[in-house]
């Protein structure tokens, strides 16, 4: 049985992540950063600048893209930490990034709940279709959930307790940096109720009523395209929530109950990866909702195909020229 060296014991006592995790995190977050930045910048530009007739869904999509961008811009700091193995940006900025890990899924779920309620209105209550064009109410709803989420996240920035304050090198961004604060357990479980269970039940309730209405044929007056689009949005939202957000919140609740002191949790790391992945999976939602976004994606794909064809032609023409030159020299 191998005896860990003093260096290994120091690393474990400092709560450092395993080397395999650091490498995986660097690769994963690099991909998420590049793809997510491209997707969400394009989406925000399309929804805010190129969409002529804005609807409530457009407003919600703008907020989703903005939230994704805010979260994505924090990834380079995490990547730097995993690459260097120490945190040089100070305790307060570490608290900000830790709070952002809690803030992002909380607000994202409420925005997805608003989109679900919007689709409920479009399918089950078509007589209120005019409300779907009332962007003012959608803006107020988004402002409300932003303020509500910020208000419950700010207390995490005001806590000074840190179990790794004396560590060398400085550490950050571990599960324990969030869950060790037993003084705010009441706040954490309240947040789980209001920012996970309630929006989740809203989404499930909307989906159940919509499916019930479709099965009973109560939506016969709707255009087939409207039904198809709404169903695709519903399926996309449901799959994204189940894959990215439900595992993260279940893990968070279990860690809070267990009071685990270890800074590294494989299950916590995996569910955090899934939660981060949602910033890229939103591209499916953008593509379904916006024709302008579809056109932009298609144009990029066509342009890439055009560039490939040009390169192939240039390579072929170059090879033909070289052959002709060789023949002329032989003659």
UniProtKB/Swiss-Prot annotation:
Residues 48-56, 117-138, 213-236, 290-331 are cytoplasmic. Residues 1-26, 78-95, 160-191, 258-268 are extracellular. The modification Phosphoserine is found at residue 322. It holds the Pfam family 7tm_1. GO terms for biological process: CD8-positive, alpha-beta intraepithelial T cell differentiation; CD8-positive, gamma-delta intraepithelial T cell differentiation; G protein-coupled receptor signaling pathway; negative regulation of leukocyte chemotaxis; negative regulation of tumor necrosis factor production. Keywords: Cell membrane, Cytoplasmic vesicle, Disulfide bond, G-protein coupled receptor, Glycoprotein, Membrane, Phosphoprotein, Receptor, Transducer, Transmembrane, Transmembrane helix. Glycans are attached at residues 14, 188. It is a multi-pass membrane protein. Coiled coil: none annotated. InterPro entries: GPCR_Rhodpsn (IPR000276), GPCR_Rhodpsn_7TM (IPR017452), GPR18 (IPR028335). Expressed in testis, spleen and brain (at protein level). Disulfide bonds join 94-172. GO terms for molecular function: G protein-coupled receptor activity. GO terms for cellular component: cytoplasmic vesicle membrane; plasma membrane. The chain crosses the membrane at residues 27-47, 57-77, 96-116, 139-159, 192-212, 237-257, 269-289. It is found in: Cell membrane; Cytoplasmic vesicle membrane. Its main location: membrane. SUPFAM superfamilies: Family A G protein-coupled receptor-like. Belongs to the G-protein coupled receptor 1 family. G protein-coupled receptor (GPCR) that plays a role in diverse physiological processes particularly within the immune and nervous systems. Becomes active when triggered by various endogenous ligands including endocannabinoid N-arachidonyl glycine (NAGly), delta-9-tetrahydrocannabinol or resolvin D2/RvD2 derived from the omega-3 fatty acid docosahexaenoic acid (DHA). Upon RvD2 binding, facilitates the resolution of inflammation, aiding in tissue repair and homeostasis. This is N-arachidonyl glycine receptor. The gene is Gpr18.
